[in-house]
Structure formats: C-alpha cells, structure tokens
Amino acid sequence: MMKEFSSTAQGNTEVIHTGTLQRHESHHIRDFCFQEIEKDIHNFEFQWQEEERNGHEAPMTEIKELTGSTDRHDQRHAGNKPIKDQLGSSFHSHLPELHIFQPEWKIGNQVEKSIINASLILTSQRISCSPKTRISNNYGNNSLHSSLPIQKLGSTHERKIFPM
C-alpha cells in the first residue's frame, strides 16, 4: 500500500515523502489462535459462573478434538471466521470451530451433585414407603398379615406387632 507523508521542515516548507507501508505477513497463526482460545475460555468461565449464581444447571459441553478431525460435523461447521489481532487488523481463519473443554474438577462437581441428588431421591422414597398390611378372614379366623415382625402372646389368635 502506498502512503504519502508530509512533514514540516525548518523554514515552514512542507516536504512530502512517499513511502510504502507493509505489514509483516506470517503464515504462523498459532499466536492468534491461542489468544482467541484464551478469550473464549475466559468468556466460557464467566458464563459458567453467571449460570451458577443464577441457580441454573450448568450446560454440558461437547468434547471434541481441536485439531486433526475430519468428520462431517467439523466440515459442516468449518468456515471463514474473522479473527482480529492486537492491532485491529483482521484476517480469515480456515480452522474448524473451536470447542472449549470443561475443566475436570467442574465435571467432577456435576457428577457429585448428581449422585447426591439421586441419593436424596432414594432416601425420600425409602422414608415414604409404608409397610404393607393385609387383613383377611380365612376360614372364619381373623388373621393379620404384615411385613413387620410378629410375636405370639399365647393363643394362635393373639398377636402383637412390633415396629422395626
């Protein structure tokens, strides 16, 4: 790109310089990718914290390889995505969409919460179950059938129920 520069020399005479501005083009875009990943991770963690504060269940993220994948999903979502460097100039990346991994300890916390919730549900189901009792009249004798232990008190018709 050609650009003209003007400067004022001694004696108030204007001198015009013509020069060429060039940007150093590098085919190594790893630095830009890492900067974008760091920004995405920061945004992801901030979003995660906001959702935890609001009491919403944290979303599960899909775990994928960042490089080397050639399945249809990656090809479908790959495209020219502009990435800006620190100087504000942008270029197009032909990299597949970046996926962020959940930190291992956050996945562990989700599993632990699920286990605790499941055990609370099982405990409440156990507490709410009442013993099954059936009263029937077989052959003219009244008898009580229960899932609780029974102790005989003397005759075959007198029984006392003891809770567990």
Curated annotation (Swiss-Prot):
<protein>
    <recommendedName>
        <fullName>Putative protein ZNF321</fullName>
    </recommendedName>
</protein>
